[in-house]
């Protein structure tokens, strides 16, 4: 399996290939090869900055002679007018890396900002915000990094690092007990040590899980606030609890106050607005 660094390198290479193709003809025709310059990253919207370390990799992978002076680090609150970094190098390199760097930093900063808003809503509770697999194909590692930068917690990275029995798994497996037992048989056969989480849709399924056991966490899918409180009381600390499904910015605090350990929010990544910023020539 590829490391995070290897995945980032492949993403950057692919992004340059799709953007530059056989050459940035606009830049090549009007900018001399030896022209040198400087550009600054200007913040145009309040939020949480994310993607600085990836941006440095973008510049250095394209042209190792580029010099990046970071003024504001990942995870720092920023406001309109802040200068986050200054980059010096060949003007051709500045122009050809500008859009990829902005695309990554705007999206990661938007996710970090959105995540931080949710996290601040839960201050004073023990509940942690989780992301989901509802990410942009190919960008998952970056988007999940942004969630962490914003103060959230990563759920499983993919299908390989945790067992999560959803409704379809249970239905196709012939029921909750069958699904859980098959998980344990499989993990033993393969010599794997993975946590098991199971989704329940109602109190009948919850009771079946409690009768069977053998899981680490129970996901309460589309439970109301009142039913969440009831379910948490029934589980009584025997397993970790997670609320999921239809939870909004307006309702998340109420769910946390019922005592769940985690709340997963797809909106952290699937419909986020990028943070406004620009990369302009400077003296």
Question: How would you label these PLM feature ranges?
Answer:
Residues 249:
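Cys/His-rich Zn2+-binding cysteine-cluster or related metal-binding knuckle/ribbon modules and their
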Residues 221-222, 245, 267-268:
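Short secondary-structure boundary segments
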Residues 1-212, 217, 226-234, 239-242, ...:
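Acidic/glycine-rich phosphate/pyrophosphate-binding loops and surrounding catalytic core
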Residues 267-283:
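Short, charged, intrinsically disordered terminal tails
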């Amino acid at each position: 399996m590829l490391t995070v660094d290897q995945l980032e390198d492949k993403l950057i290479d692919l992004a340059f290939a799709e953007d530059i193709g056989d050459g940035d003809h606009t830049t090549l025709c009007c900018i001399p090869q030896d022209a040198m310059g400087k550009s600054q990253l200007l913040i145009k919207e309040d939020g949480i900055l994310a993607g600085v370390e990836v941006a440095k990799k973008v510049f250095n992978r394209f042209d190792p002679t580029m010099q990046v002076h970071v003024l504001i680090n990942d995870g720092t609150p920023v406001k309109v007018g802040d200068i986050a970094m200054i980059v010096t190098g060949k003007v051709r390199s500045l122009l050809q890396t500008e859009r990829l760097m902005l695309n990554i930093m705007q999206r990661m900063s938007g996710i970090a900002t959105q995540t931080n808003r949710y996290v601040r809503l839960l201050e004073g509770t023990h509940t942690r915000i989780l992301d989901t697999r509802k990410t942009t194909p190919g960008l998952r590692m970056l988007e999940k990094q942004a969630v962490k930068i914003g103060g959230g917690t990563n759920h499983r990275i993919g299908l390989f690092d945790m067992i999560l029995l959803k409704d379809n798994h249970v239905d196709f497996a012939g029921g909750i007990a069958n699904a859980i037992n098959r998980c344990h048989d499989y993990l033993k056969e393969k010599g794997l040590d993975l946590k098991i989480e199971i989704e329940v849709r109602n109190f009948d399924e919850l009771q079946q899980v409690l009768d069977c056991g053998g899981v680490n966490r129970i996901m309460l899918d589309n439970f109301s606030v009142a039913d969440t409180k009831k379910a948490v009381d029934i589980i009584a600390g025997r397993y970790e609890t997670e609320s999921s499904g239809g939870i909004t910015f307006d309702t998340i605090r109420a769910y946390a106050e019922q005592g769940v350990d985690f709340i997963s929010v797809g909106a952290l990544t699937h419909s986020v607005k990028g943070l406004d910023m620009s990369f302009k020539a400077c003296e």
